[in-house]
């Protein structure tokens, strides 16, 4: 498969200042900082986007008091969180209590290192990209468990236990739903997976891997703890769950981390099933930059998360777990068997 260079050639006159390796490292660090900053900004903008979309969905105005047409509501919310008291309960395990939101934020941002936004824009071109994503997703479970246990609050602890069981369960289905794509492409590298789908929408993985896509969507919503699978923080049952004792910037890190994960899962759907930066048709659409198509597709899936929150009811915790093991697991296994059979037939 054709290799794509994501580090540009260094001009010869710059080699007199630093070595080529040093320039490459500086380029990657700068690119990573820009991408992570953009991701945080997009996640923050998604908050106000979600509030506007839910207001439209529910036939109301939404935020319209701060700035023209409510455009500065996000700034007001950020200032409010920043100036709130950063309180730590006396009975809490302070180290774990402080570590939990940092782990939640770090794992969400670090996972974006493997996302190829365009042929030349991406932090890391790793052959173990998908495995790295699952490693970060596994670490994110500890953030919720640390927050629930360190708070020494029964609602927090119940939320942490729910999160651990739900996330570990649905990460199994998340991984199995991707194995069909990996088997068809022959690579764990997201850039290779996107390149294999180039040439138009009829080459996208959504068609041969439709069952895998459905289970990935369900498992992605469950892993990000979004409605209707927001069991770890169910307000009516657990009073905000594992972050009930958090305030100020610690709560803000959990809050932003959740929306960063939504952007991450949306970007993964784009790369794995919808061709990444590939235009749907080559008839005039290719004049638009590849990053434009990536952002449009990602925004579509972010909107799907928002509309799911506004239209679906929250099931009971036992119903969520039963649905995973009794519906999602058989569907992913059937999809794997069909994919394996098709690969063997095509090889023969």
Swiss-Prot record:
Under Pfam families, the record lists: NADHdh (PF00146)
Ligase as a keyword of this entry, yes or no, is no
Where is this chain primarily localised? membrane
Q: Which InterPro entries match?
A: NADH_UbQ_OxRdtase_su1/FPO (IPR001694), NADH_UbQ_OxRdtase_su1_CS (IPR018086)
Superkingdom, according to UniProt?
A: Bacteria
Task: Report the subcellular localization.
Answer: Cell inner membrane
UniProt entry keywords in alphabetical sequence: Cell inner membrane, Cell membrane, Membrane, NAD, Quinone, Translocase, Transmembrane, Transmembrane helix, Ubiquinone
Q: Where are the transmembrane segments?
A: 25-45, 95-115, 128-148, 168-188, 204-224, 254-274, 287-307, 327-347
- Molecular function terms in GO for this entry? NADH dehydrogenase activity; oxidoreductase activity, acting on NAD(P)H, quinone or similar compound as acceptor; quinone binding
Q: Does the keyword Secreted apply?
A: no
Catalytic function, reaction form: a quinone + NADH + 5 H(+)(in) = a quinol + NAD(+) + 4 H(+)(out)
Which GO cellular component terms, listed alphabetically, does the Swiss-Prot or TrEMBL entry include?
plasma membrane
Q: What does the subunit comment say?
A: NDH-1 is composed of 14 different subunits. Subunits NuoA, H, J, K, L, M, N constitute the membrane sector of the complex.
Instruction: Describe the function of this protein.
Output: NDH-1 shuttles electrons from NADH, via FMN and iron-sulfur (Fe-S) centers, to quinones in the respiratory chain. The immediate electron acceptor for the enzyme in this species is believed to be ubiquinone. Couples the redox reaction to proton translocation (for every two electrons transferred, four hydrogen ions are translocated across the cytoplasmic membrane), and thus conserves the redox energy in a proton gradient. This subunit may bind ubiquinone.
Q: Which HAMAP family match?
A: NDH1_NuoH
The record's similarity note reads: Belongs to the complex I subunit 1 family.
Give the protein name, as stated in the record. NADH-quinone oxidoreductase subunit H
What species is this protein from? Psychrobacter sp. (strain PRwf-1)
